[in-house]
Amino acid sequence: MKPMGRREFLELAAAGVAGAAGLPVLGGCRKSRPGMAEAGGLDVAAAPSSVADAAPPAARETGYFVENFGIDEATLRRTIAEGLSRGGDYAEVFLQHKTADGIVFEDGQVIDASVRVDLGAGVRVLLGDQTGYAFTEDLTPEALRAAARTAAAIAAAGVRAAPERLVRRRPEPLYPQQPLWLPVAPAEKRSIVDRVGRKLAAGDPAVIKASVRFRAEDDVVLIANSDGVLVEERRPMTFLYATCTAERNGRRETNWFSRSRRGGPEFYTDDLLDRIAAEAVRRTLLLFDATAPEPGEMPVVLAPATSGILLHEAMGHGFEADFNRKGISIFASRMGRPVAREFVTIVDSGLERDHRGALAIDDEGTPGRRTVLVEKGRLVSYLHDRISARHYGVEPTGNGRREDFRFPPLPRMRVTFMEPGPHAPEEVIASVKKGLYAVDFSNGEVTIGAGDYSFYVKTGFRIEDGRLTAPVKDVNVIGNGPDSLSKIEMVAGDFELDGGTWTCGKNGQSVPVGLGLPTVKVSAINVGGVRR
C-alpha cells in the first residue's frame, strides 16, 4: 500500500465521518496571517496510512502521531535541530489533528451540518524575545524541516545542538483521553439538537423562532521542544447554544442560553437539554417586563457565575504578562502592591476538571496549574507564557495558548474567577439603597492599557431599598477595570463557575475559556441608558 497524501487523507477521513453522518464535508481551511509564513504544500505528503505501512523503529514507539502519521521521535528531533540551525536558543514543534462536526437547527429542521478536519504543524524558534514562526499542512518530514528553516531565519548566530532524546511526559488527565465523538452515530447527535429545538418551540405560545447550534470536537495535540519535552494529549470539546425569539403585541425579544464542556455525549442528559431550552425561553420572556433604570453612577451588584465576564475582560487581560512586559497594562508597575480589598482573591486555573477552559498542558507543553493573581487584595503574579517567564525570571504558569497550529502561543486566560468572600449574598443586596443587580452580559469593549470598559447588561434587576425589584435590560455599564477592582466593597460566599460557551479573542486568535464569580458589590459604576 502506498502512503496517502494529506489531501487524500483528509478526504477519506472526513468522508468516513460524514459518510456515516450524511453530512457535507468541510476540509481544513488555509488561513495565513501577517508576519507568519506557511511552509510546505497541500498536495504532497507521505504520512503512512497505518503503522503497518511504516518501517518499524528499533524500539516501537507509541502515540497518536507516530501511529497515524509516522511522526516519530527522530523526525521531531531533526525538525528541532533544523529550527536551531541558525542560532535560535529555543525551538518547538506543535502538531494538531482536530475533527469538529456541527449542526445548526432552526424552526424544526437542520439548516446546516458540517464536518471540518484540521491537520498540521507549527514550528516556533525563539531568539531572546524575538519569535520566528511557520506552519504547514503537510506532515511529511521534509515539510516539517522546511517550516523549521523558515522559522529559524530570524536567528543567525551559530548553531545550538538539538536534544539527544525527547522525554515523553504524561500529564494527569483532566478530561477523557479517548475519542468521544467520532464513534457517536449521527442520529444520536441529531437527537440532542432535536430535543432542545422541540422544547424551545413548545416553551411558550409567544415563541416564534427557535434556533440551536451544536458542536463536538475530537482534538489531539503534540508538543516537542529543544528542552527535551515531548507531550501529547486529547482535548475533547462540545457546546450547545439555544436561542429563542418571542413576540408579544408586535414587540419581539431574543435571548439565549448555552452549556459547554470538555466531554462526550454523556454530558447531554435529558435534564440538561430540557434546562437549556427552558432557560432560553425564560430569559427571553423576562425581557418583555424589563425597563431602563435611571442613568448615573450607582452601586452595582454582580450576580454569581456569568458576571465573571466583567472580571475576565475588564481586569483579567490586564494580568496577562505580555501586556505588562510591554508596559501596556496599568498593572505593569503594580506587582506586589495592593489592588483591591483584603477579601479579594483572583485565580486563573487550568485544573478545573472537564471545564471548557481546563488545560492539562498548555500549547507550549507546560503542565496546567492554579495561579493566584491577586491574593488578599495584593497583586502577586501575572499570567505567563515561555517568553514572558524568561523576561521576568519566573516559571511559566501554563498560560501559553494558541487558536490552532497556524498561530504562535500567547499568554491567555484559562478559567478565571474570584474566590468566595466573607459576606452573605442577602447582606450584599441589602446594603444597596438604590442600584443595579447585573445578571447577564452581552457584547462590550475593553481598552487594555487604561483598563476602560463598556458592557451591556442583557438582563438584570433594579435594587431598591435593599431588595431586587423590576427587571432591566440592555443597560450600558461604563467603568475602569482597576478602579472597579479597588471599589469592590463586598464579596459573598456563593461562588459559581459558569458553564457557558465562553470564547476569548486576542490578536486575531480565539480560544475557549471559563469564568466565575460570587456575588460582588462594586460601590460605583456609571450606568447608562438602553442600547438602541
Task: Please give the residue ranges for each predicted region.
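N-terminal small-residue-enriched
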Residues: K2-R532
